[in-house]
């Protein structure tokens, strides 16, 4: 076989069909349907609500690339080991990551406009991305699925160094904490479980706050946890001892980060404290650098850069904890 010409290699490298086919399969839940017995294009189309002829083309392409295998007649399909992580119940399931309609999947689509990020330094999705994800009812079901999946695993470990928030900060001085932008409440739940004297309030936008509240209600700390709908660009609940900002600022430009810190400063007052626990996303070369920058403005701020933002927001550092993957800084109004 002749060696491919350079232009052929380039077109192969730039091809979007196979990534799109895999993500369509994840979005349409086709792997789950195949496992449940819908193994022909007709049966899959009926189960998934898709067009039989296009579904057949998709299945044949998935077989060509090794995601599926077909029987001798080319009618019945089954998953290969490569395709099995597309199952929702696979131990290493990638379906949520690869779905076009998931938060992660939608964020990944920003790579299609990488030229915008290279030209401007800004992510393709700005604050409007988060507003859409957190307010669009279509995402409420996703948040609910994630919350129930987390609850189904006993002793769900915290990731990205978040465990140091629970174990390295001196929580004995606090009685109340507000988790600002606390997502589904994993960190707040861990805090309340490890420090039974604490009471916690989670603040986030509508979809995620409602799911976090339902998750708290199902937990053993229901009497000490609440979730309220709100934005960290608006006034926050006042009077708590500690305001936690975990993995928030990387998603925002410097001026927005200063605004967020300022809202925490105003709510904390002269006696309160802010615990900044920002993540510096690890990069393994230019590929991950480009991926992170296409989705967030500042994925890897150093501790010094974070401290400069805090100073601009009228805050001083009163304690320095771990740095690296997770930078921990306790802050107080200047």
Where are these regions (language model features)?
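Alpha-helical subdomain
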Residues: 1-64, 69, 82, 171, ...
């Amino acid at each position: 076989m002749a060696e491919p010409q350079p232009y052929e290699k380039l077109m192969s490298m730039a091809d979007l069909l196979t990534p799109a086919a895999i993500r369509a399969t994840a979005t349409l839940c086709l792997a789950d349907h195949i496992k449940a017995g819908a193994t022909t294009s007709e049966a899959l189309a009926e189960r998934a609500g898709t067009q039989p002829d296009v579904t057949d083309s998709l299945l044949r392409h998935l077989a060509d690339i090794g995601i599926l295998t077909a029987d001798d007649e080319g009618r019945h399909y089954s998953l290969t080991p490569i395709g099995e992580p597309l199952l929702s119940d696979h131990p290493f399931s990638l379906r949520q990551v690869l779905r076009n309609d998931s938060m992660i999947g939608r964020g990944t689509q920003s790579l299609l406009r990488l030229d915008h990020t290279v030209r401007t330094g800004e992510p393709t999705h700005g604050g409007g991305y988060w507003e859409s994800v957190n307010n669009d009812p279509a995402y409420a079901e996703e948040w609910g699925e994630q919350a129930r999946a987390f609850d189904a695993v006993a002793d769900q470990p915290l990731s990205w160094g978040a465990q140091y928030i629970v174990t390295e900060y001196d929580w004995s001085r606090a009685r109340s904490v507000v988790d600002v932008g606390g997502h589904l409440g994993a960190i707040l739940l861990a805090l309340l479980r490890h420090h039974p004297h604490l009471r916690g309030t989670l603040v986030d936008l509508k979809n995620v706050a409602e799911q976090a509240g339902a998750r708290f209600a199902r937990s053993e700390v229901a009497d000490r946890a609440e979730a309220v709908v709100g934005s960290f660009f608006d006034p926050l609940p006042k009077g708590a001892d500690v305001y936690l900002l975990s993995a928030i600022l990387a998603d925002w430009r410097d001026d927005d980060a200063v605004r967020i810190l300022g809202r925490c400063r105003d709510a904390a007052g002269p006696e309160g404290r802010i615990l900044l626990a920002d993540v510096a996303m690890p990069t393994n070369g230019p590929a991950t650098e480009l991926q992170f920058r296409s989705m967030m403005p500042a994925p890897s701020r150093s501790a010094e850069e974070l401290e400069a933002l805090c100073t601009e927001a009228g805050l001083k550092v009163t304690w320095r904890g771990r740095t690296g993957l997770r930078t921990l800084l306790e802050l107080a109004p200047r």
